[in-house]
Amino acid sequence: MNYTINENETLKKMTSPLANYIFNKKDGTMLTWGEDKDKEASRFPAPTILDIEVTTICKGGCPFCYKSNTSNGKNMSLENFKHILDIFPRTLTQIAFGADADLTANPDLWKMMEYAREKSIVPNITAAWFDEETADKLARYCGAVALSRYEHSKDKCYDSVKMLTDRGMSQVNMHFMLAEETYQQCLDTLGEIATDERLKKLNAFVILSLKAKGRGVGFHKCSQEHFNEIVNKAQDLHIRLGFDSCSSAKALEAFYFDENIEKCIISCEAARESSYINVDGKYFPCSFCEGTKGWEEGLDVLSCSNEEDFIEKIWNDPATLKFMEKLNNTTDKHGCRHCPIYKV
């Protein structure tokens, strides 16, 4: 393997010829660079970030769920989860758990998080709401937690934010799925963040751009004009903003006046740095490409027996490399990579 890992209780460092990082396991800060510190990493020798789906069961009923999840579904077993982490390259720094609205569907969720911690991997997760007992467990295991803001569960979302910040968590964010149909709700939410006492310790408001998949089909992407209006209002209210990498092109346009903004925004890293594994243990470059052309079936991670197997059969599989090449060919005038599947 053409990389080395060094770590202690606080920091994890990976060095390789074309991609390097320093990751702070305490606060989630991650610095990445390529051949030298002025260049972007071209591709990591193995994933540093893993999005893993541990259940398809969800009673949240969100109108634009791209997974189209319902109360009927299945869970990933603890055995399969452990196998995935056991064979995964040591480059991995953190996991984003894909679970259900209130984090009750998979009874092994907390054992999974505990196992990740044993391997010095930081668990992160997104929910819509939860109870006090769940908040205790999240504060114990997670580095960051995001609360999805839906109109039908707004107060439960805000209450859940306060539960975590009351427990001393600093990396508590709010996620908002932005489409033309939700644009006004987004503006209203910014106003509420500025005035609602439950949200006074919120870390950041994070915009997730629509990918028209699942129940999201029928929604329409937000215009650049409306996107800019949201950014401007957040700045006027002194609210910290974040974006998913899918929103990078719009964010660069919205912050055109800031000459340093390109240093702060990272475009799509699928098949370059990040990875996704579904509930069946199948790999896809990202969760949104599952079931799309060329990715009707994923790559079987459970068949891998060790780290070398994963790198050869999954990370360097021709299908993965083809996706990366297609993504790299979408680069625009800002050097920003655009989604090769959806119009975002």
List each model region and its residues.
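Hydrophobic beta-strand positions
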Residues: 22-23, 276
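Conserved alpha-helical substructure of the radical SAM core
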Residues: 4-16, 24-140
